[in-house]
Each structure stands twice: as C-alpha cells, then as structure tokens.
Amino acid sequence: MASPADSCIQFTRHASDVLLNLNRLRSRDILTDVVIVVSREQFRAHKTVLMACSGLFYSIFTDQLKCNLSVINLDPEINPEGFCILLDFMYTSRLNLREGNIMAVMATAMYLQMEHVVDTCRKFIKASEAEMVSAIKPPREEFLNSRMLMPQDIMAYRGREVVENNLPLRSAPGCESRAFAPSLYSGLSTPPASYSMYSHLPVSSLLFSDEEFRDVRMPVANPFPKERALPCDSARPVPGEYSRPTLEVSPNVCHSNIYSPKETIPEEARSDMHYSVAEGLKPAAPSARNAPYFPCDKASKEEERPSSEDEIALHFEPPNAPLNRKGLVSPQSPQKSDCQPNSPTESCSSKNACILQASGSPPAKSPTDPKACNWKKYKFIVLNSLNQNAKPEGPEQAELGRLSPRAYTAPPACQPPMEPENLDLQSPTKLSASGEDSTIPQASRLNNIVNRSMTGSPRSSSESHSPLYMHPPKCTSCGSQSPQHAEMCLHTAGPTFPEEMGETQSEYSDSSCENGAFFCNECDCRFSEEASLKRHTLQTHSDKPYKCDRCQASFRYKGNLASHKTVHTGEKPYRCNICGAQFNRPANLKTHTRIHSGEKPYKCETCGARFVQVAHLRAHVLIHTGEKPYPCEICGTRFRHLQTLKSHLRIHTGEKPYHCEKCNLHFRHKSQLRLHLRQKHGAITNTKVQYRVSATDLPPELPKAC
C-alpha cells in the first residue's frame, strides 16, 4: 500500500527558477565557461545552456576536438544585436522581436540552427505583412523587375549547363546562379553585410495568381529584346526545343526545388520540367551570365559574391551535416508544435538527424488548418508586442515600410515551370485570381482589427470593402469617425463596439432616455451622459447601503461599517491578553495571537516554509518566481512587496512619519523607531516573546511600541 511519501510531487516553477538562477549567474559572471565573439563583441555564457538551445553549439561542444574551446568566434556577418537577443532568449525564454531587428534575429537563428525561433520570426513577418499586401502590392511590371526577396522565399537553385549529346558536365562559373545576397536586402536600411543568407529556404506564397504567374514563367513567344541575353546562355544553343522526356534528362540539368513551408516534397517525387523555347531565338554570347528575365546591371554584378552559407561552412560546420534540413522533422519532434525548441538529438547537426535522413524516413505533414495553432497565446504574446511597439512613422520608416513587404523576382530562365501541385498550396496567405485575399490567417485578422481600431490609420480602397474592418460609427455631435474619439468626446452616449453597447443597454435597460437626457428610475435624477447615470447608480442605489460619513466607502453589512469607522477614530477595542497590543479588528487580534502560540498554518509548497498570515505566504512565493511587480516611478527600482515600495518612496519624498514622543526625533521607517526605543529608552518592542506576565502587570513607566 503506497504511502503519501511515495507520491510524485510536481514543482511547476522549478524550470523557470533554474533558468532564472542561470541568468543571474551569467549576469554576475559565475561559472561561465565560454566566450562568444561576434564582430569584436564578447558574450560570456554557459556551454550547457548554449548546447541545449542551439544545434550549432551542440555540434561544436560534442566534438572531441572542439569541446574544450573557451573562445569561439562566430561568422563576422552575424549581427551582434541579433545574437544578444537570442542569448537573452536562451536564458529568459523571452524573445524581443521588433520590426527593426526581425531580420537580424532570423538570420542569426538560422546560423545557430534554432529552428523554432526561425519559425516564430516567419510568423511574425507574415502577420505584419498580411495587412500591407493589398495596400502596396506592386504592379505586374514591378513584379518582373523586382530584385528583393524575403529570407523565407529564397529558392535553392544552382545553375548548371544543359548536357547535350552526352558530353561531360563542364564547370561554368558564368552560369553559377546562387541567390544574390546583397540585392536581397536592397530595400532595407540595414547594410546587407549584417545578415547571413541561406539558399535552402522555401518559397511560401506568391503575390500573383497561379495563372498570372504561369504566364510569366512560360512565355510562348520570344520575351527577350534582341539586345538582351538569353537565360542560361553558357549552354550551347540547340535549334530544336529544349524539352525532353523526363527519363532522358540528366540529373545535372538546372532545375529548382520549390518547397512548401509546411511540407517537404521527396526528391524522387518531383518531375523535371523544362522550357520550350521557340526556334527563332538568337543565341547569346558565351560569356554572359545566367540571369532572370530582367537584365543585371554592372554594378550589381560587381557586388555579387557567394552566399554566406559558404562562409558559415568555414566556421564550425558539422562533419555530417544533412543536406535537406526540412526532411529531418519526425512526427514526435517538438518542432511540430509552435515555438518549441528541438532537442539536441533532433537538431539539424546531430548524428541522429543524419541517421534519420539516411534511413529515408518520410517527412511528416503538419496541420494546415490555421485553427490548429494556439491563436490565443499568439495574440497575447505577438500582437500585444506589436501594438506596444507601434510608433509614428517618419520619412525613413515610411520608405522602409514601402519596400520591406514581400516582393519577388521573376524565376530564372533556367528554372523549369512547376506544376500547380508543386506550388505553395498550403500557404496560410493566398491570393485568388483577382488579386484579393482568399484566406487570411486568423492571427493576421486579429492583427488587422486590433491595429486599425487602436491607430485609426487610413485604409486603402481595397481595404474599405473588406468585412474584416470594423467601421467605427460617426459621432452624432461633431461627426468624427476616429476610434479614440468615442473615449474622449463628451457628447458620446455609449461605447463604440456593438457588443459593449448591448451590455450597457442590458445593464441599464430600466433607465429611460429622452432627447439625450438620462433619468434614474429610482430617484428621477437627470443626467446628460449615460456614464454619469452609471456612476450615480453605483454610488446611490447599489447593494451596499451602509456608507461612511467621512469617506466614500460603502459596505453591505452594518458591522463592517462599524469596524471601518475605527480607522477614522483611532479606536482599538481589541486587546491582546499576553502582550497588551491593541487592534481595531478582531481578525487582526486573531492573527496576532499566532505570534505567541507559534502557530503557522500557511505553508509554502515549494520550500516548506510556514507563515502566520496568508499575505506573508503570498509575498514569499514571489521569491521563487522572481517576480517584482512593483516598480518605482521615479528611479525605476522594482520591489517584490507593495509595502517595500511605499517605504522606498519616502527616500524620494523625504517623509519621516514615525517620531519618538520623548525626544521628538523622526524616522523614515518603523523599524528605525523601534530600534531607537530599544537602545535609547529601554522599551520592550519584541512582542514575539511568549510573555508569562500579563499586560496589566507591566510597569507603567515602560513604554511599549506596537
């Protein structure tokens, strides 16, 4: 038979307490065993924490040749601010995302192989861009000439020559067409060198419909002017068509793999499709580079360089790093749940991940239904931070907001047209053939409604017909339609939103309203505003009829009012029989007697400490949680208890409310007065002693402090 001692006790705050203590050790530089150098900035940390959170550090410290390193230099292109945010996230589980640092954090998270952070950054970007797509969607010409891609939309392609007549594949650097890293951030204010680029990221959604995009990618006639180079021009021209049966195509033929953000298509399931080019096309010069439909200027060619993935490989690259990282996720992996980190064994660089890939385990599909995610938690964490960080846009920020939304380059000419099923059919944000939003994620809808209702920003013509926008009614007095106007205008009779109006009308349905005047049915008082009627009803006709004649306090029972009046009169009729202390309420006397009896009925479940009052237990629990909810508005110091904050405020105000009646000295804190009475006047202030003598036997000349 199991005894209570055999049961398992779950400490809910243990994990957060350990993380808090580790962060304190890091801040005090205690037992930190590694220094991370990022662009000449040093960050001290613990190897165990880095290994538990980052796949890159896990691969470093599990290597026998690198496990004893005390200084690690990361890639010079890693942004120190992004790494600092991720390091704080490792120790606090709080990710500080803003529009200004989202790209740096995302690039650094990719480099550190923190997939759960990358997914969160992608959701942050999608949520912020969904409301701007319709307002700033570029026309078709801008779409063809655009050079900017968002990091999650970089396609993994590498141009190679078409093998003709079974000739061996030649090394053609002119046709090498990796993603152009500097141009990806040409629309951002941050220098492109601050971010690392990766060529394995999926294309999530398109700005145009499938039919419109297919017209762009599959030209029937000659789409190039005579002076413009053909795509994949380093390949030898063939008078016939380029298209061949799939089985005859060499695997080295240039093709692109377009992945869905929710699903990885197996390599053998993809079909290679090639363009059918007309016979009358002119061959291009052999030295011309492989280019998309738009011509590349010389300046951009001079800036072109290999992607940062090669530079990252120069630093700690795992020996058996998998090629396709998306295919490593198992159905039981924590990555399948939102914002959950991979365990070290499931990280991209781990040996188990390589084994999983070698075994050919099929990738699992995550749920595509937007309702499968926890939108309540997303709304509380992400949307609230978006609203709090909202600032008025200046000229630079307005230009950044115009260029930062998702824009796509036309696919390179050597890229085959993909079938509709290979396109992003599971993307949360889709566009129909007419260009309108067909399905928008629930988080984006919440974001649109909250931001528009709080900021009152002007809407575009496409948004004006959207059913998602809640139009605030015009003010009947001044005609304003601002959402904030309902709270500030004195002529507004009720709240803005219909559900609030329904609650107000149901609560005060027994009151009458005539010609804008509100009458109370209890006493026939007249008010010009419904808020004044509500205030009058609560103060006059509430269920607390007993009111204090000295203050605005009201009580439901007469005895509570009598106890309250002792606060004003200073009367303390309840006396302790042991020490003589007096109290104005019997409950306070009952609590006081526990000091003499030694009874401590309130126990802390975390550490087992016991307390006399439940308020003391609540204050003690904050020690384990690390919470300090009471900040000083003057100096910013935070306190665990409200009384400590009140005592601290006396330092700023100079108040000294406690004074000695014998020598007329004033003290800021009660403890200082009690110490003064004991040392200077010999008073007995320690009431915790179990006195054997009653209070009536105490000498009259001996002062007593409460």
UniProtKB/Swiss-Prot annotation:
Keywords: Acetylation, Activator, Chromosomal rearrangement, DNA-binding, Immunity, Inflammatory response, Metal-binding, Nucleus, Phosphoprotein, Proto-oncogene, Repeat, Repressor, Transcription, Transcription regulation, Ubl conjugation, Zinc, Zinc-finger. The keyword rRNA-binding does not apply. Residues 317-349, 407-467 are annotated as: Disordered. Phosphorylated by MAPK1 in response to antigen receptor activation at Ser-333 and Ser-343. Phosphorylated by ATM in response to genotoxic stress. Phosphorylation induces its degradation by ubiquitin/proteasome pathway. Polyubiquitinated. Polyubiquitinated by SCF(FBXO11), leading to its degradation by the proteasome. Ubiquitinated by the SCF(FBXL17) complex, leading to its degradation by the proteasome: ubiquitination by the SCF(FBXL17) complex takes place when aberrant BTB domain dimers are formed. Changing residue 379 to R: Abolishes acetylation. No effect on interaction with MTA3, NCOR1 and NCOR2. InterPro entries: BTB/POZ_dom, SKP1/BTB/POZ_sf, Znf_C2H2_sf, Znf_C2H2_type. Induction: Down-regulated during maturation of dendritic cells by selective stimuli such as bacterial lipopolysaccharides (LPS), CD40LG and zymosan. Protein levels decreases upon genotoxic stress in a dose- and time-dependent way. The keyword Oxidoreductase does not apply. Changing residue 21 to K: Abolishes interaction with NCOR2 and HDAC2, no effect on interaction with CTBP1 and transcriptional autoinhibition. The modification N6-acetyllysine is found at residue 379. Residues 32-99 form the BTB domain. Residues 376-379 are annotated as: Required for interaction with NuRD complex and for transcriptional repressor activity. Homodimer. Interacts (via BTB domain) with the corepressors BCOR, NCOR1 and SMRT/NCOR2; the interactions are direct. Forms preferably ternary complexes with BCOR and SMRT/NCOR2 on target gene promoters but, on enhancer elements, interacts with SMRT/NCOR2 and HDAC3 to repress proximal gene expression. Interacts with histone deacetylases HDAC2, HDAC5 and HDAC9 (via the catalytic domain). Interacts with ZBTB7 and BCL6B. Interacts with SCF(FBXO11) complex; the interaction is independent of phosphorylation and promotes ubiquitination. The BTB domain mediates homodimerization. Its dimer interface mediates peptide binding such as to corepressors BCOR and NCOR2. Interaction with corepressors through the BTB domain is needed to facilitate the rapid proliferation and survival of GC B-cells but is not involved in the T(FH) formation and BCL6-mediated suppression of T(H)2 and T(H)17 differentiationrequired for GC formation. PANTHER family: B-CELL LYMPHOMA 6 PROTEIN ISOFORM X1, ZINC FINGER PROTEIN. Transcriptional repressor mainly required for germinal center (GC) formation and antibody affinity maturation which has different mechanisms of action specific to the lineage and biological functions. Forms complexes with different corepressors and histone deacetylases to repress the transcriptional expression of different subsets of target genes. Represses its target genes by binding directly to the DNA sequence 5'-TTCCTAGAA-3' (BCL6-binding site) or indirectly by repressing the transcriptional activity of transcription factors. This is B-cell lymphoma 6 protein. The gene is BCL6.
